[in-house]
């Protein structure tokens, strides 16, 4: 009984924010997909404009160009990746990242390739023809394969470098994976996108478990953030600023586990309570 209660309390303390917390002055944020979708753009601008935090953005296009965020050139660095489905392009981007003088301590995986397909009333690809398979392969390579490779690279090559060089205040790392609530319920459209995000859910669970078991000096906290469902592109654009602020607030609090963006509850809230109750039955 005591052992069970202890485990629940440890999980609770991790969840509410002990350990690593985002520090605007000491942390540098690496965003994967920071300018090819509305949320990425808002995240870049929120970190730079509101918190004066250094941001590294890896994406296919730099649509932050011309925005207010670009006024602070010292805070914003763009790394081009022409094609996230091409491993060679990813390797070139990672090499560029590794050679930068600034080193990220917070990694946000925000790949949202194919998210617009979830806005359709009916799935675009009802049959697995060649077009459907090609689209599926691209979405999975963008949203899942690239995230896995970049995360592994940061854990193996980037974070250890920070650990060795950074001051005590900057030690500790955050990995944030952005998924979708659509992975948690049946949906009639956007199946390719949703499948890729289901893969992200599994990868997040795996990397979290690996970091707990691995004999490493790295202090890495993980968080999976679920996007809400969107009714239209206008709805997605309208919610992105508040979603961005919600996510940053979670990092400031040192949230661990999971959170549903634009919601006061998380999956972790329910699981924690359920787990605590079941320990007495």
Curated annotation (Swiss-Prot):
Changes seen on gene knockout: Suppresses the lethality of LCD1 and RAD53 mutations. Leads to resistance to the chemicals that inhibit nucleotide metabolism and increases dNTP levels in the presence of hydroxyurea.
Pfam families in UniProt: adh_short
Stated induction or repression of this protein's expression: Expression is induced by the KAR4 transcription factor.
An example Gene Ontology biological process: deoxyribonucleoside triphosphate metabolic process
Function field: May be involved in the regulation of dNTP production. Induces the SOS system when expressed in E.coli, therefore, it may play a role in DNA metabolism and/or in genome stability.
Protein name in the entry: Oxidoreductase-like protein SRL4
Gene Ontology MF terms in the entry: oxidoreductase activity, acting on the CH-OH group of donors, NAD or NADP as acceptor
Entry keywords, A to Z: NADP
Key word Cell membrane present: no
Designated gene of the protein: SRL4
UniProt KW NADP keyword: yes
SUPFAM superfamilies registered for this protein in UniProt: NAD(P)-binding Rossmann-fold domains
InterPro entries in alphabetical order: NAD(P)-bd_dom_sf, SDR_fam
Residues that hold NADP(+) according to the record: 39, 60, 67, 152, 197
């Amino acid at each position: 009984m005591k052992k069970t209660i202890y485990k629940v309390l440890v999980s609770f303390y991790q969840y509410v924010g002990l350990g690593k917390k985002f520090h605007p002055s000491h942390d540098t944020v690496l965003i994967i997909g920071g300018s090819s979708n509305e949320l990425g753009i808002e995240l870049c601008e929120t970190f730079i404009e509101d918190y004066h935090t250094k941001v590294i953005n890896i994406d296919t296009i730099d649509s932050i160009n011309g925005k207010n965020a670009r006024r602070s050139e010292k805070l914003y660095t763009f790394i081009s990746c022409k094609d996230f489905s091409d491993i060679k392009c990813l390797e070139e981007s990672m090499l560029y990242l590794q050679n930068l003088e600034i080193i990220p301590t917070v990694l946000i995986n925000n790949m949202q390739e194919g998210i617009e397909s979830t806005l359709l009333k009916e799935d675009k690809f009802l049959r697995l023809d060649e077009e459907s398979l090609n689209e599926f392969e691209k979405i999975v390579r963008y949203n899942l394969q690239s995230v896995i490779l970049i995360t592994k690279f940061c854990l193996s090559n980037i974070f250890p470098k920070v650990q060795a060089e950074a001051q005590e205040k900057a030690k500790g790392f955050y990995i944030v994976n952005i998924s979708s609530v659509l992975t948690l319920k049946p949906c009639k459209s956007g199946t390719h996108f949703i499948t890729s995000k289901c893969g992200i859910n599994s990868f997040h669970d795996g990397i979290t478990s690996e970091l707990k078991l691995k004999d490493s000096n790295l202090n890495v906290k993980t968080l999976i953030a679920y996007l809400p469902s969107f009714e239209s592109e206008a709805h997605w654009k309208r919610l992105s600023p508040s979603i961005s602020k919600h996510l940053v607030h979670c990092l400031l609090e040192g949230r661990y586990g999971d959170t549903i963006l634009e919601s006061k509850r998380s999956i972790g809230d329910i699981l924690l309570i359920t787990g605590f109750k079941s320990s007495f039955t």
